Amino acid sequence: MKTKFIFVTGGVVSSIGKGLASASLGALLESRGLRVTMQKLDPYINVDPGTMSPFQHGEVFVTDDGAETDLDLGHYERYTSARLSKRSNFTTGQVYFSVIEKERRGDYLGGTVQVIPHITDEIKHKILENAKGADVAIVEVGGTVGDIESLPFLEAIRQFKADRGAGNVLYIHVTLVPHIKTAGELKTKPTQHSVKELREIGIQPDILICRCEMELPRDMKAKIALFCNVEEKAVITSTDAEHIYAVPLALHKEGLDEQVVEKLNIWTKAPDLSPWHSVVEKLRSPLRGEVRIAIVGKYVNLTESYKSLSEALTHGGIANDCRVVLTYLDSERIESEGIGSSFDDIDAILVPGGFGERGTEGKIKAIEYARTQKIPFFGICLGMQMAVVEYARNVCGLEDACSSEFRPDCANPVISLMEEQRDIDRLGGTMRLGAYPCSLTKGTFAQKAYGSLEISERHRHRYEYNNAFRETLVANGLVVSGLYKEGDLVEIVEVADHPWFLGCQFHPEFKSKPLNPHPLFRAFIAAALDRKDKRR
């Protein structure tokens, strides 16, 4: 089958839910037996989000091949079986970088390099490269229609219909239908203007996904269809769902996937959505109650910074048939005010990744509390590193132990810069990134969770466990349960004399899915449930 292309744009406001809509559509099409690939086009000039502040951009999602990408790719991987790569996310910066490189090589034979056709051709080339081998390629265009940054991308996808044929290209526009409480009415005018602006560019949307607080009445759907030149059945209501994993079911009920396959003339089997129904039922009515997990971090005022993490914890709850309630605690506040009653109602503690010294002493206090009070603990990336520092200080007696990231001249740098990072003077794309193999020690928390001795996980770091201190730490009871053998790099540490205490250098949250929860999150939530049951 010739690859079909679905382009998803957004209008009226940003953060309207294009990523979730795209991911949900991917899940629906996969349930019909189609091979789906996903892609995000980001209009910002940064080459990638790797050096952007979490407060501005939210989470950086890492793929197996080491791409630092937009957090929407996390949605795509969680909702579909698509294995995403560096080709799955590109920015204005990457496009212009490629075109300028070609111009310097002389690829354009002295011609004047312009937005049309050179920039738009490069965008189309990158879309086509990612779509190889797929039945359907879903491409989300970041930003909002009307943004000046988005214009080259919109022009490129406009050209796709002429290039690939009208029957092989579909445009979906996600828009807002606000409810004006003082008037008690839903207003369609913002949607009309957004579609008008899109049509001025040359794109006629085939389907509208209308984000609103309540179901759109039939007469309002008819009005939107009339003014926006779409079929009434192609006006899809999308209200806020009880759980984000209910969105595919809600969009299916509205007929989104039926409209897509009909308009693209694709014959498919009937959708099998039973796995999604099972997930939603477990979220709605868990048999084992709830557990409370504390996330001790420095970006807690913007929880989008921990998007994959919070979702992976939810997946752990699905696997254990319980609801996971998250409490975000500011590590700086713990650093200045102490533990106090922060963990009185908590069943487990998690310290996530991050960069920089700010708030790290608060994380160390939380880790010490988890270790000494026998509370299940999970440390990820920086969280694992701070667990090593805490153990070195409070168990091994190395009082000035620290990471050389924060104190380059400390006497006991139990966490140090990786050897291959020492001569690097550029920040962008230079960390240890992507999937690496890890060998597990039999009988440890990690090995029992995975049920295997060999695993592969995704990384994003520059600093590592300092092997110069391994003998001392191991002699005092800190178990090395996971090792990257090729570089003799410690990947996982544990405290054996503890209900469940594990720190890992990698980011397991990037590989967790609602239909396939990650083994470590499954085990962590199980340990939290066990503690909760014993405290009754």
From Swiss-Prot:
Region (Amidoligase domain): 1-266
InterPro entries with a match to the protein in the record: Class_I_gatase-like (IPR029062), CTP_synthase (IPR004468), CTP_synthase_N (IPR017456), GATASE (IPR017926), GATase1_CTP_Synthase (IPR033828), P-loop_NTPase (IPR027417)
MF term (GO), any: ATP binding
Record-annotated active site: 381 (nucleophile), 507, 509
Segments forming domain Glutamine amidotransferase type-1: 292-534
Keyword Plastid: no
EC number: 6.3.4.2
Binding-site residues, CTP: 14, 147-149, 187-192, 223
Pfam family, one: CTP_synth_N
Protein activity control: Allosterically activated by GTP, when glutamine is the substrate; GTP has no effect on the reaction when ammonia is the substrate. The allosteric effector GTP functions by stabilizing the protein conformation that binds the tetrahedral intermediate(s) formed during glutamine hydrolysis. Inhibited by the product CTP, via allosteric rather than competitive inhibition.
Binding-site residues for Mg(2+), renumbered to this chain: 72, 140
Gene Ontology biological-process entries: 'de novo' CTP biosynthetic process; CTP biosynthetic process; pyrimidine nucleobase biosynthetic process
Enzyme class per UniProt: ligase
Record carries keyword ATP-binding: yes
Disulphide linkage map: none
Catalytic activity: UTP + L-glutamine + ATP + H2O = CTP + L-glutamate + ADP + phosphate + 2 H(+); L-glutamine + H2O = L-glutamate + NH4(+); UTP + NH4(+) + ATP = CTP + ADP + phosphate + 2 H(+)
Coiled-coil annotated spans: none
Pathway(s) served: Pyrimidine metabolism; CTP biosynthesis via de novo pathway; CTP from UDP: step 2/2
Protein task: Catalyzes the ATP-dependent amination of UTP to CTP with either L-glutamine or ammonia as the source of nitrogen. Regulates intracellular CTP levels through interactions with the four ribonucleotide triphosphates.
Anything else known: CTPSs have evolved a hybrid strategy for distinguishing between UTP and CTP. The overlapping regions of the product feedback inhibitory and substrate sites recognize a common feature in both compounds, the triphosphate moiety. To differentiate isosteric substrate and product pyrimidine rings, an additional pocket far from the expected kinase/ligase catalytic site, specifically recognizes the cytosine and ribose portions of the product inhibitor.
Protein family: Belongs to the CTP synthase family.
Protein name: CTP synthase
Organism: Geobacter sulfurreducens (strain ATCC 51573 / DSM 12127 / PCA)
